[in-house]
C-alpha cells in the first residue's frame, strides 16, 4: 500500500497521525487560536472553514489561511469546509463549495483539502484533478451523525472515494450501539486488507466509538482526530492523552 507524504509527514505507516481542528469565527480568533495550537502535540492542522463568519469574502478567508501558514509553517494544513448536511456549521451551494475549495487550491497556502464524496460525482472528479494539478492532496470524506450503515456500504463508500482518486478516503459514523462500532472496525479491516491501495481514515463517533479513535494501527485507520481545546466532533479526546495511547499501542 502506498503512503501519502505531506511536507515531512508520512501518512499510512507507523502510529496513526493526529489531526486537530481549528474552529475560529474571524481573523482575530484565527490568530489567537493558532498561537495556542502551536504549542500542542499533533501532526496535521485542519482548519474548519465552515466556522468562519466572513465566508463570502474570499480575500478574508485566504488572509486567515496565510496567518495559519505563517504561525505553523511546518504543519500540513488541511482546508475543510464541512457542509451543514454532514454536520458542519453553514450551508452553501455546491457551486460556492467548489469555488471555495478551488480558491484554497489556487492560494498555494494549503497542503490538503477535504472534499465530501456526496457533493456530486462530476464536481468531485474535476476538483480532485484540479487539486492534484496544483500539488494539493485530497481527503475525500463522508459523515453520518445519525447512524452506522452495514459494513458492505461502508466499504463501498471508501472504494468509491478510492476510485475517484482521493489521496485519503475518510468516513466518520455515529454508532447506535457497541455492535455498530464493531461494524465500523470490521469494515475498516476488510477495506485495508482487501481493497485499499492508499491510507484510509475511519472513526466511530461519540463516547461509544472512542476505541475506534485509538485502535487505528490495529484495524487500518491512518489518522485520528484529537482536541486541543474544544472537540470538533463527539468522542474526541485531548491530544496529549491521544498521543500517549497511540504510542503505547505502537510500541506494544
From Swiss-Prot:
Q: In which pathway does it act?
A: Metabolic intermediate biosynthesis; chorismate biosynthesis; chorismate from D-erythrose 4-phosphate and phosphoenolpyruvate: step 3/7
Active-site residue numbers: 143 (proton donor/acceptor), 170 (schiff-base intermediate with substrate)
Q: Which reaction does it catalyse?
A: 3-dehydroquinate = 3-dehydroshikimate + H2O
For biological process, the GO terms are: 3,4-dihydroxybenzoate biosynthetic process; amino acid biosynthetic process; aromatic amino acid family biosynthetic process; chorismate biosynthetic process
Ligand binding (3-dehydroquinate): 21, 46-48, 82, 213, 232, 236
Residues that span the membrane, as ranges: none
**EC no.?**
4.2.1.10
- Reading the lineage from the top rank, the first entry is Bacteria
Which Pfam families does this one have?
A: DHquinase_I
- Presence of the UniProt keyword DNA-binding in the record: no
* A Gene Ontology molecular function term of the record: 3-dehydroquinate dehydratase activity
Instruction: Please name the CDD domains in this protein's record.
Output: DHQase_I
- What keywords are annotated for this sequence in UniProt? Amino-acid biosynthesis, Aromatic amino acid biosynthesis, Lyase, Schiff base
Q: How does it assemble?
A: Homodimer.
* Function summary: Involved in the third step of the chorismate pathway, which leads to the biosynthesis of aromatic amino acids. Catalyzes the cis-dehydration of 3-dehydroquinate (DHQ) and introduces the first double bond of the aromatic ring to yield 3-dehydroshikimate.
Indicate the family of this protein.
Belongs to the type-I 3-dehydroquinase family.
Q: In its UniProt entry, what is this protein called?
A: 3-dehydroquinate dehydratase
